[in-house]
Amino acid sequence: MHVISKSAWRDAVAKDPALERPIGEWHKVAKHAEWKNLAEVRKVYPHADPVGPYTVFNIKGGTYRLIVKIEYRWQTIFVKHLLTHAEYDRGGWKQ
């Protein structure tokens, strides 16, 4: 899959350098994936959850939430947000 809009995670890594490895591992898996639907995503990431039009991944042991929009038809992932668990829970990202 082609991963677009990585600036959200670059900003998060600048704030927490320990994110670099786990987000890099996620990216490595995602860019080589050919997912056709959420069921296929969950074979690799069982805790990936659909939230409206987005898919949410736990990153760094659940400390962070990676929010993406996956266009399976075009094999493209748009990174929307990389938030701490607390930021995610506040829900402002949904607007």
Labelled PLM ranges:
Residues 79-83:
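Catalytic Cys-His active-site segments of thiol-dependent hydrolases/isopeptidases
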Residues 1-63, 71-76, 86-95:
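Basic, Lys/Arg-enriched alpha-helical interface segments
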